Amino acid sequence: MNKNPQRFTITAALPYTNGPIHIGHLAGVYVPADIYSRFLRMQGYDVAFVCGSDEHGVPITIKAKKEGVTPQDVVDKYNGIIKKSFEDFGITFDNYSRTSGKTHHDTASAFFKKMYEDGKFIEESTEQLYDEEAGQFLADRFVTGTCPKCGNEEAYGDQCESCGTSLNATDLINPKSAITGAVPTLKETRHWFLPLDQYEDFLKEWILKGHKSDWKSNVYGQVKSWIDDGLRARAVTRDLDWGIPVPVEGGDGKVLYVWFDAPIGYISSTKEWAEREGKDWEPYWKDENTKLVHFIGKDNIVFHCIIFPVMLKAHGDYILPENVPANEFLNLEGKKLSTSKNWAVWLHEYLEEFPDQQDVLRYVLTANAPETKDNDFTWKDFQARNNNELVAIFGNFINRVVVLTNKYYNGIVPEPGAYSEIDEKTIAELKAYPSVIASSIERYRFREAQGELMNLARLGNKYLADEEPWKLIKTDEERVKTIMYVALQIASALSIISEPFLPFTSAKLKKMLNHVDESSDNTPDWDIIGTKEALILGGHQIGKAELLFSKIEDEQMEKQLEKLEATKTANAMEDQKAEPQKEIATFEDFTKMDLRVGTIIEAQKMPKTKKLMVLKVDTGIDQRTVVSGIAEHFKAEDIIGKKVTVLANLAPRKLRGVDSEGMILMTENAEGKLVFVNPDEDGVKAGTTIN
C-alpha cells in the first residue's frame, strides 16, 4: 500500500457516447471523483484527473444504423453534449479525451502489440453467433437473449444488466440478432484471447490478501466471487468494422474489443494532458510513488479490478490501481435508471431548467450516494434537501453573518475581545473539522464527509442562535465584536472546505468574504484551517450579502414529476403487447351477438366489494341492470349519462346476489386504466345497434 504518494492519477470511467450524462453517472462516478481530486489539489498534491469519451463498440454502431448515420456522427454528437455538460457542471478534469482520437489509437495499438510480441495472448478458432440475413458476426450487443444466471430475457451478448454478470454471446439462452431479429447460427472465426485463468494466483495475492482491509466491501465481495468461480480466457478482438484495427498479421476485419481498448483511454488521456502541460506522462503510470485510483460504477468492477489489472501486469511496465471505490446504482423515483427508456434526469436538461444550481444537484447526489448499496433519487428529497439544509442551514448562517457584519461594522471584520468558554469550544470544534472531513474523503466516504461539512454550518447557526448578537448589540457592543469575529471564522472555514463539494458556492462565498485571489500563494487551503490562528483578521473588509441558495417551489417539482409521468406513459404504450388472436369465429357467430349503444342512467358501488359497480343502463329497448367490475377505475357520479357499448343478449348471470343482464365493453390504456368502448360522435342514440 502506497502510504506517502508523490502524485495521484485519478481516473473516472469513460462515459459511453451513445447518449448524454444522467444523474446515475454523476452520483456513481463523476461527483465523487471530482470531490476527491479537488480535495487532493487543495492539499498540494500533484494530481492528474483524466477521463474521456468511450467511442467504440457495438451499441454505437447499432445507434448509427437506426439513425441512418455513421458511427463517427453518433460519437461526435454525444461527445459534444457530454463534454459541455461536464464543463458547465464544474467537473475539473485535467484532460477529457476521446478514444476515436489518434493518440488513443496509437497508444492502444502499441499496448496490444507489446503484449502480442511478448506472447501474452492465446490465439484460438471459436464458434461465434452469426446473422445470416445481415451477413455479419453478432458481437456483444448485436445479440440479446435470456441470461443463464438470472433468467433476464433482455440480456446482452456481453453482459446482463439485471444481475451484472459478464457474458459471452454464446452463453445466452434463445439468442436473437439485434439487427434483424433472426435466430443466429454458429460460425467459426479466429481471435486473440487474454488468458485470465493464468493470473488467478496473482489476483488472489494482490486483491484477496493485499486489499482485504482497504477496498470497499461491495467491490471486494464481487471480485472475490469472480475469482472463486474461476476465471476464463477472454477475447480481446472482435469481428467489427468500427474500432481500433488489430495491428498484427491476421487482424484484417477485426478490431480491439472495446473492454480492452477503453481502459487504455486513461493512459492516452494522460499523455495528451502531459504533452499540453510540458510534462512527462510516464511517472503518472509507471512510478511506484504514484497512487492510481479508478472511480467507476458497479457494472465496471470486473473490468477495472480483474481485467485491466491483468492487462497492466501482463504488459509489465505499469503500476496497479491502489483502490477502485466503485459505487452501486442510483435509482430514480424507485425505478432503475434507463437510457434506452429515457427514465433519467439528464444533466444537460437539468442545467437548462435549474440555471446556476449546479451545487444543489451535487449536494443531493452526494447525500444520496449509492456508496455500498443502491439508493434512490426523488424530486421530493431534492427539494427538501435544498430548502431544509442548503437554504435553511448553510445559506441562512452565511447570510446572517454577512448581513450583521455589514449592519454593525460597515463590512469591516471587528477586532475580538477575550474569548469566552463557548468561544474557545467553538473555535476548537471548528479546527477539528478539516481532519475529520479529510479522513472521510481519504476513505472514499463522501456522503459522510459532506454530512460533516453541513454539521460545521450547523455549528455556526447554533453559535449565533445561542449568543444572540442582535440582542446583545444594545447592551454589550464589545461582546458582539467577539461573537461576530468567531462567526466569521466559521464562515471563512466553510468557504474553504466546501470547495470540493460545492465549488460554485465556495467561489461565491470567497468573493463575498473578499478572500485573497485564488491564484495567489496566500489563498487559504485545506490545512490552514487547523493550523492558522485566524482565517480572517480584524480590519478586513468583506462584501455585501448575496443569497447562496434559493428556495425551490412545489411548482418546479410538479413540472419534473409530470415529465417523468409522460415518459412512463410513453414507455407503457411502447411496451404494450397486443393479445394474440383468438380462434376463428364464423360470420354466423358474430351475428348472434346483439351489440348496441346504451346510456348509464344510474350507478352505485356494490357494498362490501372493491371492484363491482351496479349500473342501470338504457339500451333503447329497455332499462336493465348490469354488474361491471369498474369500481376501482371510476366514481359512480362521474359515469351517469355516459354512452357505452352493451352486449345485450348475454345470458343473465347472478353476481353477489344481483342479476346482471348484459356486459359493458371495456379496454385498457397504456397505464392499465379501464376505458369505455363507446361512439365518439354526438347524436348516437341509446339502442343503436353495432354491426
UniProtKB/Swiss-Prot annotation:
It catalyses: tRNA(Met) + L-methionine + ATP = L-methionyl-tRNA(Met) + AMP + diphosphate. It is found in: Cytoplasm. GO terms for biological process: methionyl-tRNA aminoacylation. The lineage of its organism: Bacteria, Pseudomonadati, Bacteroidota, Flavobacteriia, Flavobacteriales. One of its GO terms (molecular function) is methionine-tRNA ligase activity. Homodimer. A motif ('HIGH' region) lies at residues 15-25. GO terms for cellular component: cytosol. PANTHER family: METHIONINE--TRNA LIGASE, METHIONINE--TRNA LIGASE, CYTOPLASMIC. A motif ('KMSKS' region) lies at residues 336-340. Is required not only for elongation of protein synthesis but also for the initiation of all mRNA translation through initiator tRNA(fMet) aminoacylation. SUPFAM superfamilies: Anticodon-binding domain of a subclass of class I aminoacyl-tRNA synthetases (SSF47323), Methionyl-tRNA synthetase (MetRS), Zn-domain (SSF57770), Nucleic acid-binding proteins (SSF50249), Nucleotidylyl transferase (SSF52374). Signal peptide: none annotated. The keyword Hydrolase does not apply. Its cofactor is Zn(2+). ATP binds at residue 339. It is an enzyme of class 6 (ligase). The keyword Cytoplasm applies. Belongs to the class-I aminoacyl-tRNA synthetase family. MetG type 1 subfamily. InterPro entries: aa-tRNA-synth_I_CS (IPR001412), Anticodon_Met (IPR041872), Met-tRNA-synth_bsu_C (IPR004495), Met-tRNA_ligase_1 (IPR023458), Met-tRNA_synth (IPR014758), Methionyl/Leucyl_tRNA_Synth (IPR015413), MetRS_core (IPR033911), MetRS_Zn (IPR029038). The gene is metG. This is Methionine--tRNA ligase. Its EC number is 6.1.1.10. It comes from Christiangramia forsetii (strain DSM 17595 / CGMCC 1.15422 / KT0803) (Gramella forsetii). NCBIfam families: metG, metG_C_term, PRK00133.1. Residues 589-691 form the tRNA-binding domain. Zn(2+) binds at residues 147, 150, 160, 163. Keywords: Aminoacyl-tRNA synthetase, ATP-binding, Cytoplasm, Ligase, Metal-binding, Nucleotide-binding, Protein biosynthesis, RNA-binding, tRNA-binding, Zinc.
